[in-house]
Amino acid sequence: MKMNKSLIVLCLSAGLLASAPGISLADVNYVPQNTSDAPAIPSAALQQLTWTPVDQSKTQTTQLATGGQQLNVPGISGPVAAYSVPANIGELTLTLTSEVNKQTSVFAPNVLILDQNMTPSAFFPSSYFTYQEPGVMSADRLEGVMRLTPALGQQKLYVLVFTTEKDLQQTTQLLDPAKAYAKGVGNSIPDIPDPVARHTTDGLLKLKVKTNSSSSVLVGPLFGSSAPAPVTVGNTAAPAVAAPAPAPVKKSEPMLNDTESYFNTAIKNAVAKGDVDKALKLLDEAERLGSTSARSTFISSVKGKG
């Protein structure tokens, strides 16, 4: 398959460019539609994949160990995830999340965008998907937002997610959940080490699709930005799309010993000071993060046995 580009121009809204903080030279030179660094994938191999339809109605979840597919192409390691996205609903915003597993490993995603003729149109390397700290309703993750503008006549776009041998040699520095929680509630940051996640061929991916109802003023051509830039892709004939695979359900995982100890101590201290509301909030957060002892610690503390 030739790696010729079908996208028309890379554009940025004036407001988006002005609001992008601290753009470095490397960020400015990043051009999503430059697919020369992406693996060369034969058309026949792409046609053999099952492309899971994703729309705005729900977030598509894929556990690569069970829902991934094999694509035996040089430059790609382990299973891949393949999605199809409607291209006739306006400008698209795709948010891809790769969740950290047990504070020890994470899948470093690369994304190749193809038009409806399976022609490579944009490439987002693993460096585009940056580490996001855990929050009240979110886990540690690698995440990136891609803005795509399908050309007129496009019916579908294709999103191929994979990792590489180079990515597997690298790691991601995480933030311990106890530190993240302490920062969020204004407590002192505990002096505990941050975990490091190795990159693996397995992981939990989440893809969310949105459309922008209001059009923005676009200027171009530009080189790019650290902020997501809309990429125009396009051609006309649409290939057939296979049925989606079912999405597995993620199980909650136990937290690390240091994190467990931090929350248990914080719960005991809150109860000792008579601040039961704070203790309950700590309990809820600890159990959300996978604690198996926070509830018993809370109960024993309230009973005066903590």
Swiss-Prot record:
Transmembrane segments: none annotated. Residues 1-22 form the signal peptide. It is found in: Periplasm. One of its GO terms (biological process) is carbohydrate transport. Its main location: periplasm. Keywords: Periplasm, Signal, Sugar transport, Transport. One of its GO terms (cellular component) is outer membrane-bounded periplasmic space. The keyword Cell wall biogenesis/degradation does not apply. NCBIfam families: PRK10564.1 (NF007855). Not yet known. Might function in the uptake of a still unidentified substrate. To S.typhimurium MalM. This is Maltose operon periplasmic protein.
